[in-house]
């Protein structure tokens, strides 16, 4: 069953990217990238991880815009993916990109300090 949840998650990720970029006209929803979709084993709940280009204020307004469009997004997913019941969608920020950038910055600083000491 886990394999099916993964396949549904990947299909939802692809469709959500298209829906968010082409169908949602809300100005609050700007540069959004769907980084991952985790679907529960019973296919009832889908957690969508997104990254947003911008500051904290833009991220918050984007999340509010997506929350407002959640019903529309869910109906679009239901039309595009044939499931008995369309999963309940929740949006969360993907913090892993920020963590990765922070680690990369720290590694560059350590590398520069190591070259100075030589």
Curated annotation (Swiss-Prot):
SUPFAM superfamilies membership: Ribosome-binding factor A, RbfA
Top-level taxon of the source organism: Bacteria
Gene Ontology biological process terms from the UniProt entry: maturation of SSU-rRNA
Family matches, as InterPro entries: KH_dom-like_a/b (IPR015946), RbfA (IPR000238), RbfA_dom_sf (IPR023799), Ribosome-bd_factorA_CS (IPR020053)
Matching Gene3D superfamilies: 3.30.300.20
Keyword Magnesium applies: no
Keyword Methyltransferase tagged: no
GO molecular function: ribosomal small subunit binding
Any one cellular-component term (Gene Ontology): cytosol
Keywords: Cytoplasm, Ribosome biogenesis
One Pfam match: RBFA
Subcellular localization, as worded in the UniProt entry: Cytoplasm
Family annotation (PROSITE patterns): RBFA
Protein family membership: Belongs to the RbfA family.
PANTHER family according to UniProt: RIBOSOME-BINDING FACTOR A, CHLOROPLASTIC-RELATED
Subunit organization: Monomer. Binds 30S ribosomal subunits, but not 50S ribosomal subunits or 70S ribosomes.
Function: One of several proteins that assist in the late maturation steps of the functional core of the 30S ribosomal subunit. Associates with free 30S ribosomal subunits (but not with 30S subunits that are part of 70S ribosomes or polysomes). Required for efficient processing of 16S rRNA. May interact with the 5'-terminal helix region of 16S rRNA.
Listed name of the protein: Ribosome-binding factor A
